[in-house]
Amino acid sequence: RCKNNLRQIGIAIHNLNTSTGFFVDGGKDWWSARSMQGSTPRMAPHQNWGWLYQILPAMEVNNLYHFQPDYKIRRTPVEGYFCPSRRPPSVLGGLRAVNDYAGNGGVCGQGGGLSDWGEGKSGVIVRGGYTPKVTFETVTDGSTHTILVGEKALHPDHYNLFSISDNEGYTSGWD
C-alpha cells in the first residue's frame, strides 16, 4: 500500500503540473495561514501551505481542501498520506496531522536539513515564496532521473512523538 500511496501522490502532482505548467511547492512557512483568494484556496507559488495540502483536490479530498477553519484542516489526517506498515493516520498532540512522505527539496548542507528560508533550491518541491516556479524544463537531470517524492526517513521510535523531523504536519510542506 505504501507504493500505491506514492503512485497516487505522484499522479496527483503530475496532474496539477499538467493543468498549471509547474510543480507544487513546499509552502512558505509553518506559521502562516492558508492563502485564499476570496473563498478559494490559492495554488503555488501563492499558497503558504505545502505541497501535500496543494494536491488534496487531485487526491480526491476536495472537501478537506476547501474546509474551514484552517485549524480543522491541520488536525484532519489524510489516509493516503500514511504508510500502513508504518503507522495509522495520526494527529500529534491533537494539533497537527502528520504524514509519512517527503518531497525532494534538493541537496542540503552538511547538517542534513533544509533551512526554512529557501536553501536547497535544487529540488523539484522547493520552499514557496523564495524561488521561481519549478517546471519540467528546470529539472536539469531530466524527470526520469529525479526523485519527486519518497517515504520520509523517521526512526520507528519517533512515529508517534514530536520528533523534530515529524512535528509540523502535512500542511506545512517541509517536515
Name each region found by the language model:
Residues 1-175:
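Internal low-complexity, small-residue/proline-rich segments
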